């Protein structure tokens, strides 16, 4: 799932749902820059939620554009609070995590040429000795898919599309474009070559839009507030 945007009832739901899964993946925009709650306060609360989730499941958390909180050592914006949240059961920006033949690579939202190169280097390093399956967390959806269309305009990430072509991951989890699954001609899933790309979308409701992946049955179950779909992988 992605784009919770500091909607605390959705985080509460996620903590309860974590009882039934092995891994929780949140693909960007945990915080919300237009919320009346100061960003510095939001991140304190969000770190507590990450800790609660980590008591129940492995947590993978990638940053989105709303999560940036200041310049890194290179002068480009990073989600410093999220990087500081990493721990034994919480895997964040810039890391990879291997379990049961699957590698999860968690990419940060990049803000300029230096952080873009950091992502390129991260993916190249993670490609070495890759296991049977490789999954990326990357907030923005790639060019060449319906996942980057909001019904009026496209917001394609050409760099991600190029990296997918170069490395051929099995699955990329994205977000960012909230309306993508529900616009005319839209969807929550797409293919680029042999790579599946998912964007669960974001809508109001007591339960957030989310995707549950069963790696034994090789299925993806999308809950889309008004819709539901099961996909064979």
Q: Can you name each region flagged by the protein language model?
A:
Residues 32, 67-162:
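Conserved catalytic scaffold of divalent metal-dependent phosphoesterases
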Residues 6-98:
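Core catalytic region of metal-dependent phosphoesterases/phosphodiesterases
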Residues 1-3, 24-29, 58-65, 91-93, ...:
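Active-site neighborhood of phospho(di)ester-bond hydrolases with catalytic His/Asp-centered motifs
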């Amino acid at each position: 799932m992605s784009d919770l945007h500091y909607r605390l009832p959705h985080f509460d739901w996620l903590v309860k749902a974590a009882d039934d899964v092995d891994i929780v993946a949140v693909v960007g925009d945990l915080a919300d820059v237009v919320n009346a709650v100061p960003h510095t306060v939001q991140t304190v609360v969000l770190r507590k939620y990450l800790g609660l989730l980590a008591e129940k499941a492995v947590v993978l958390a990638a940053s989105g554009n709303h999560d940036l909180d200041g310049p890194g050592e290179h002068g480009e914006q990073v989600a410093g609070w999220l990087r500081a949240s990493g721990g034994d059961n919480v895997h964040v920006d810039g890391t990879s995590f291997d379990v049961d033949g699957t590698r999860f690579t968690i990419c940060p939202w990049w803000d300029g040429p230096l952080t873009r190169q950091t992502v390129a280097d991260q993916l190249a390093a993670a490609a070495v000795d890759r296991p049977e399956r490789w999954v990326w967390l990357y907030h923005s959806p790639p060019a060449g898919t319906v996942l980057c269309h909001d019904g009026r305009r496209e917001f394609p990430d050409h760099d991600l599309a190029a990296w997918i072509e170069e490395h051929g991951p099995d699955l990329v989890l994205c977000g960012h474009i909230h309306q993508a699954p529900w616009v005319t001609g839209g969807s929550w899933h797409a293919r680029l070559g042999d790579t599946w790309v998912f964007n669960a979308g974001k809508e109001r409701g007591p339960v957030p839009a989310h995707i549950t992946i069963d790696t034994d049955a090789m299925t993806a179950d999308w809950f889309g507030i008004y819709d539901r779909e099961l996909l064979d992988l």
